[in-house]
Amino acid sequence: GLYGINNINRILQNNNPNDAIIWGINTYKVGDPILFNESNIFSPLIHNNTKGKIVGIQPKEFEIFFTIELEQSINEIEASGYDFLLEESKQGKSIITFSINKYASTDEDNDGNVVPFQVAYAVSIHKSQGLEYNSVKIVITNEVGEQITHNIFYTAITRTREKLKIYWSPETEKTILDSFDGKKSLTDAHILKNFL
């Protein structure tokens, strides 16, 4: 829908002024925030939900090279045995370069043609578990308001370090807040007062 993760990511990526590189069915731009997914290509060193940013893209005829700035530090010893080039590390972040093949290998265990990350200007509440951001914007439409449990709401509002903004209608706000029991609501109210 209009407020779905894929649509929001597309809209926000369109505001990135860098050149679009289309690879398969996906579009990538230098500057795109990304999240590594369940692919085992760099596991366990770079795991599901590792955050990063695309800092370089070099498409070739049969492969594409991505340079990613990770929000974690990796040293040369940790990187040995993985199929990426560890470049410089600065301010607690490492930069890696790796290639993805255009076509699938005949080896069923080979993920060499699978891009191991997704563009992540926006992520679902479920996908955001365990992550932190300086600024969080939450969109809760009327259609999903009744599905937001206390635990889901708590997860959503506690992803931020500094700024929180919730976009919802007055009706959706009332539905969600009325669904919480008294003790938990006081805790949530305290958390919200600190960020709103």
Task: Identify what each model region corresponds to.
Residues 1-196:
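Core RecA-like ATPase module of SF1/SF2 helicases and allied nucleic-acid translocases
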